[in-house]
Curated annotation (Swiss-Prot):
Residues 1-25, 652-683 are annotated as: Disordered. The lineage of its organism: Eukaryota, Metazoa, Ecdysozoa, Arthropoda, Hexapoda. Its main location: nucleus. InterPro entries: ARM-type_fold, CBP80, MIF4G-like_typ-1, MIF4G-like_typ-2, MIF4G-like_typ-3. Belongs to the NCBP1 family. This is Nuclear cap-binding protein subunit 1. PANTHER family: CAP BINDING PROTEIN (PTHR12412), NUCLEAR CAP-BINDING PROTEIN SUBUNIT 1 (PTHR12412:SF2). Component of the cap-binding complex (CBC), which binds cotranscriptionally to the 5'-cap of pre-mRNAs and is involved in various processes such as pre-mRNA splicing and RNA-mediated gene silencing (RNAi). The CBC complex is involved in miRNA-mediated RNA interference via its interaction with Ars2 and is required for primary microRNAs (miRNAs) processing. Also involved in innate immunity via the short interfering RNAs (siRNAs) processing machinery by restricting the viral RNA production. Component of the nuclear cap-binding complex (CBC), a heterodimer composed of Cbp80 and Cbp20 that interacts with m7GpppG-capped RNA. It comes from Drosophila virilis (Fruit fly).
Amino acid sequence: MSRRRAHDTEDESYDHRRNKRRRVSENQEIEDRLESLILRVGERSTSSVESNLEGLVSVLEADLGTFRLKILRILSDCAVRMPEKCTVYTTLVGLLNAKNYKFGGEFVDYMVKTFKESLKLCRWDAARYSLRFLADLVNCHVISATSLLQLLDTIIDVSNEDTVPQVRRDWFVFAVLSTLPWVGRDLYEKKESALESLLLRIEVYLNKRSKKHHNALRVWSSDAPHPQEEYLDCLWAQIRKLRQDNWAEKHIPRPYLVFDAILCEALQHNLPQITPPPHHDAIEYPMPWVVYRMFDYTDCPDGPNLPGAHSIERFLIEEHLHHIIETHHHERKDCAAQLLNFPFKHKIPLEYCIVEVIFAELFHMPTPRYLDICYGSILIELCKLQPGTLPQVLAQATEILFMRIDSMNTSCFDRFVNWFSYHLSNFKFTWSWDEWDSCLLLDAEHPRPKFIQEVLQKCLRLSYHQRITEMMPTTYAKLIPVMPVPNYKYTSEEAANLPGTTVALQLVGAIRQKCTPEEVVNILKEIPSSGYSGEEMSDGSFNALKIDFCGQSKFHVVFRALAETEEAQICILHNIFELWSSHQQMMVVLIDKLLKLQIVDCSAVATWIFSKEMTGEFTKMYLWEILHLTIKKMNKHVIKLDTELDNAKEKLSKADSSSSDTDEDTPHKRKKPITHADKPSEEVVERMEEKLEAANVNQKRLFLIVFQRFIMILSEHLLRSDTDGRDPDTDWYRWTIGRLQQVFLMHHEQVQKYSSTLETLLFTSDLDSHILEVFQQFVALRA
C-alpha cells in the first residue's frame, strides 16, 4: 500500500509540473501573439488603420487583467523604437484609456519613467521620442494640456542654467521645438496664451545663444543658392511658419480624429512634476549640426512640389527618412526598399528627398554616422530598384555637387571623391566627362580638376591603369594617374654612379638566396667599413630591402634594428616614397603595415608628412589618408589601454568586495570568491596605469606635432603673402586650412582632451586670426 501511494504521489507531482509547463507555454504563446499584433497594427493593407485599432483594442482589453505589465512594456517600447507610428500608438492608448482609466494612468506613469530613464542614461533620441509621445497623448485626451505645458516649461528652464555647456541647453530646446508639430494645434486651441509664452522664452534663448561653431559644420562656405542654416535656427523658422499657418500641418497622420467622439469622453491624467537631471562633466550631449540643402522646387520636374525649406513638412519628411536609414542601414536592400516605400510618397518628389537626405548623412559634420560605403551601397540599391528615375536624380545631384565644389568643405570633398569613385566602379565607370572639360582650363590646384584627379586615383584602386586610360577622353590626359610602378634606383642606368649600389646589390643577392634576417644584419654590420656616410648607408639598406609586405614581415627584426631613432624611421619613410611615389595605394598600405609592426612611430609619420620633401604631395588626398590612419592607430591604442585598465580595476574592486562579503556570510550562503588567477594584482594595475600614461603622453605629442606644423606653414604663407602684397586666399591655403579643420573635427573626441594644452602652447591670442578661428570653432562644438 505504501509503495502504491508513493507511486501515486509521483504521478500527481509529474502531472502538476506538466500542467504548469503547459500553462507557461500557453501564456508565452499569448504574449508573443499580443506583441505581434501590437507591432504590426496599422500595417495591414487590406483594412484601414482605424479598423485595425478597434480590433486590437478589443483583444488587449480582454487580456489586460493577465498581461497588463507585458502590454505596458510593449507599448512603451513601440513609442521609442517606432516613432514613425507615434500617432497610431497614441490612438491605441487613448482608446484603452477610454475603456480602462486605471490602465491609462499606469501607462502614463510607465511612459514618464521611460522618459526620465532615457534622460538619465543619455539616450537622447529615446528621450525625445518619449516626450513626443507624451505630447501626442494630449491629442487623444489621455493627458491634460495644462500638465504638458508645465512639463515643457520645466524643460525650457534648462535654457536659463548658468555654467553648463550650451549643447545641453540647445538639446532641451530642440526637444521641445521638435515636439510642437504634433501638439501645437491642440495647445493653440486650448492654451494659446501659455503656448505663446513658451515660444517667447524659446525665442529669447535662440537670439542670445552663440553660433561660433556654425562655419565649422557647413558643407559649403557659400550660401548661394541654398543657405546653410544651423539646425535650431532652421527648426525655429519652420515652427514660426507653422504658427503663421495656425499650426495646421499636412504630413502627420492623425487616426485619433476618427475616434474623437469616444476619446473626448475619457477622463484625462496629469503628468507628475518632472525635473531634468542635473549636468555633470561626464555627460556628452548631441553636437550641433547644419541642415543640408541641395534641392528646391525649381530642381524637381513636373509633379508633386518639394516642400519649402521653412515648411514643417520638410522637417518631418527628412526626420522620417533619417530614421529609416538608422533602422535599416545594416541591410542595404531592406533600407532601399523601405525608403522607396515611404508613406505619402505620391505627395512629394520622393527620389529628390531621398537623395538629399542620403547626401546630408554622407556630408554630416564633423563625421557621418556610418561608413561612406554604407551610403554608396544604399544609393546603388536604390538605382536598381528605381532605374527609371533615381539614376537621373543622382546624376543631377552629382552635377550640382561638382558645380558647387569650389566652396565645399575639405572633409566633404574627400567623401564626395570616395563616393563618386565607388559609384562609378559599380556602373562600368560610365560618365559624361565631356560636360566637365571646362575644368581643364583651371589651375591644377583648383577643386574641380583636383576632384577629377583624385577620383581617377581612387578608381585606379578599384580597377587597373589601362581601364582608367581607356575610359577617359584624350583631353583629360594630364589628369590621368601615371602607371603605378616602383622606382628602384639601383637598377637604373645611373646606378653605377650612386653611392650604396654595391651594398644594395649584395643585399638583393642575399635576399634572393632566401637568406635569414640574421644574415642580413651581418651584411649591414659591414657597411661602415665601406666608407659610406650614415645617410648613404641607410638609403642603400632600405632600398635594397625593397619594402613590401613580405619584406616587412620576414625582416621585421632588421627593420626594428635600423629604425631605432626617429631620424632613421623618417629615412625609411623617405625611401618608401622614393620607391613607390607613383603608387599611392601602396604607400598607404605599406605605412599602415609599418605602424602595425611598430617599425615606425606615429610621431615620425607626422613629421615626415610635413617635411619639405613632401611639399609636392601636400594637397593630395592619400597623404592625409596616411595622417588620419596614423592618428586613428594612436587613438585606438590609447582607448585599448584605457579599457583594459578599467576592466582590471573593476575586477580588483569586485574581488575585494567579494572577499569581504564571503567573510561576513554564513557558511550556508557563502558566495564563490573570485579566483586568484582572475584577480589582477595591484602591481599589474600600476603597470597598466603607467602604460596608459605613456600612451597619453605620446598621443598628446602627436597632436602637438601636427598642429604645430600646421601653424608654422600657414603662418609662413600668410606672412609671405602680406610681405609680397598678394592675396593669401589661394587654392593651396584653402586646402591647408581645410586639412587643419579636418584633423580637429575627425578626431574631435581625442583632441578635446588636450584643448586646454593646445590653447596654452599653440593657439594663443597672438596667432593669426584665420588660424585661431579654426581652433575656436572646434572648442565651440562642445561649449
